[in-house]
Every structure is written in C-alpha cells, then in structure tokens.
Curated annotation (Swiss-Prot):
Keywords in alphabetical order: Amino-acid biosynthesis, Cytoplasm, Diaminopimelate biosynthesis, Lysine biosynthesis, NAD, NADP, Oxidoreductase
Protein's name in the database: 4-hydroxy-tetrahydrodipicolinate reductase
Residues that bind NADP(+): R36
Residues the entry annotates as binding (S)-2,3,4,5-tetrahydrodipicolinate: H157, G166, T167
Sequence positions that bind NAD(+): G9, A10, G11, G12, R13, M14, E35, G99, T100, T101, A123, S124, N125, Y126
Gene of this entry: dapB
C-alpha cells in the first residue's frame, strides 16, 4: 500500500527537496502540499514548483481542511507554524516528521504532549551520516571527554535564522549526556573580551554564517599534543530530504510516541 505524504512549506528550499525525494522514492507519494496563508504559491502545482513537472497536487493553504489527504506530514518550517500543524495532526490522528529547529522549552513540551496521541519523529537533522556522527561522538566522549577540551564548530548559509544550529546543539547534548554534564550549565556559546582561562568541563560552540553553505559540523576533542576531529559536511539538502522520507516510512505504523533518527536507524544496536 502506498504511503501518502503531505509537505508543509512546499515552496521553500527544503520543501522542494522533499517533494523531489518523495517523487523519487518507492512506496510513497506526495498527496498534499501546503504553504502559509497569503503565499503567492497557493494554487501552484507542487511538482512544477519542485522542478519535476506537473503531478496534479495543488499547493493549498488550509492544513485542517485537507488532513484526510495524507497519512504522514513532513514539516520543516518555523516553530510557531509547526506547533499549529502539530496540533492539527494530533487532533486528526496523523503522524508527523518534524524537522523544524529553534523550539523553546514550551514548544518542546507541546511536542511531547502531542506524542501521547500520535507518532512523531523529532530530529534536529535527518541526514543518516549526521546521526551516525552522533553515535561516534558518544564513543569519543566516553574515551577522551574527561581529559580534553571539546569544541563544536558549525557553518550554515546566510539565511539560517537560529544559532547555534539544532544539529550542533544535539551534538553537544549527546556529548554532555555521555559525560554526565548539563549542556545548559556547561555549554559556552559566546566568547568575547577578557574571558579568563578555559575551564576543562566547558563544551564550546562557534558559529559561522556565510553564502550558501548547506551545513558543516566539526567537533574537536583536543588534548595537549593531539586532537581528534569528527566532522560531517553536507553538499546537498537532498540528504536531509531522503532521511525524512525514510523516517516517514518508519513512523507510518506507529500509533503514538516520540522518536528520533536513532530509533529510525536502530543505532542503539550498533
């Protein structure tokens, strides 16, 4: 049976990549596409927007009125919009792949509450490679973390509105959890002026925003005389789109629960 997927933010960079990925994947179809109220793209053919030709799926405005047209919704938009979409899907019993970043604590609580009614995959990054890196970071932290300085450097395109990236924060959280630290108290997100010596238990973050960088993350485990670097560089958003489609297939038969790509890829059994 073909899985019907809906995409919100269909006219954005990520939305178009998602449409392409769904079109190319087996066992799924794009059955609904949505854009924000007042968008000039409403009424357009989603396939033509994504550059794959006419597919007969019209970009619409109202998610609520068209929720019966999809089985799983993929959302890579903004926190305020994503929470509205999530509430609609929870009311309609539709599972969600959530790739939006930048949620505050209240937003994260709303996601957890919705997961009591529907299945949700919530991940900061849907790249298979990045999620493998998360696992490698845990192993490196276990071996080196208490004996070295840890720094996370991330770079993205000039249009990204949040910093550090959700992926960088997830990397920090994986490391902090492994070391028994709290990222809220051990994370250092800005250094300026006379900062004093670096504390050994800090987890530092550095952010770069430039041009059209898709996404690059490098983590240093730096000791005196040697440094281990674990890095991931994305050259195309298609890697994120393909991962999201893979997650949509995985979540299709789940009744409820909050999951991430570790669950989708079964990384805990590596």
């Amino acid at each position: 049976m073909t899985l019907r997927i809906g995409v919100v933010g269909a006219g954005g960079r990520m939305g178009r990549q998602l449409i392409q990925a769904i079109h190319a994947a087996e066992g799924v179809e794009l059955s609904a596409a949505f854009e924000r109220k007042g968008s000039s793209l409403i009424g357009s053919d989603a396939g033509e927007l994504a550059g794959i030709g006419h597919i007969g799926v019209t970009v619409e405005e109202s998610l609520t009125d068209r929720a019966d047209n999809f089985d799983v919704l993929i959302d890579f938009t903004r926190p305020e919009g994503s929470l509205e979409h999530l509430a609609c899907c929870a009311a309609k019993g539709k599972n969600v792949i959530l790739g939006t970043t930048g949620f505050d604590d209240a937003g994260k609580a709303a996601i957890k509450a919705a997961a009591e009614k529907i299945g949700i995959v919530f991940a900061s990054n849907y790249s298979v490679g990045v999620n493998l890196v998360f696992k490698l970071l845990e192993k490196a932290a276990k071996v080196m973390g208490d004996y070295c300085d840890i720094e996370i450097i991330e770079a993205h395109h000039r249009h990204k509105v949040d910093a550090p990236s959700g992926t960088a924060l997830s990397m920090g959280e994986h490391i902090a959890k492994t070391l028994g630290r709290d990222l809220k108290t051990h994370g250092v997100f800005c250094r300026e002026g006379i900062t004093g010596e670096r504390k050994r238990d800090e987890i530092g973050f550095s952010t770069i925003r430039a041009a059209d960088v898709v996404g690059e993350h490098t983590v240093w485990f730096a000791d005196i005389g040697e440094r281990v670097e674990i890095a991931h560089k994305a050259s195309s958003r298609m890697t994120f789109a393909n991962g999201a489609v893979r997650a949509a297939k995985w979540i299709a038969d789940k009744k409820q629960g909050l999951f991430d790509m570790t669950d989708v890829l079964d990384l805990n059994n590596l």
